Amino acid sequence: IGSLHIPVGYKDLIIRGELLISKENYEKNFKGKTSFSNPRNFVTGLIGTKNPNEIKKQLKYIDFVSYAVLNPVLKQGLQFKTLRELELNQKLKCVHFEYISSHLTTELLDTHLSQTKTKDSYEVDGIIICHNENYTNPVSGNPKYAFAYKNEQFTNKKQAIVLSVEWNASKDKYLKPKI
């Protein structure tokens, strides 16, 4: 992930985002060649590895995708405008922001989620709904001013029956289940 040169006028800029691999990069370079079943698990596994050479080798496939400006405090729409400017000028990737409607319905959200899953470069499991206002970001946990809309129809969840659970004590005396 290359360095980001912040343009003049963005003093003390703080951006929040997440590390992702595009569907294309995962399919082309890692699907079936790794123990990770999907792009999200692949990135989590890569970041969690203790092997720095493995991280270095595969980091070129990982993108930092921004989705919020924490400082300065801006309305949601202005945050995305700022991120879009940085994306165009600095090749910083950002999530897509669009006004859907002032009257949201399940049908409208399902349609938007389906279209987003199809056209987005990254694996998407939901969309975030929020009002275009200034908000204080929480120190921990999810923000109270926004919520994630997901639909079971669009997820890769499977139902399974657990036949047995083996409980083992860890070195710190915690019980850990093994299915």
Role assignments for model-derived ranges:
Residues 1-179:
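RNA/tRNA-interacting regions in translation and RNA-turnover enzymes
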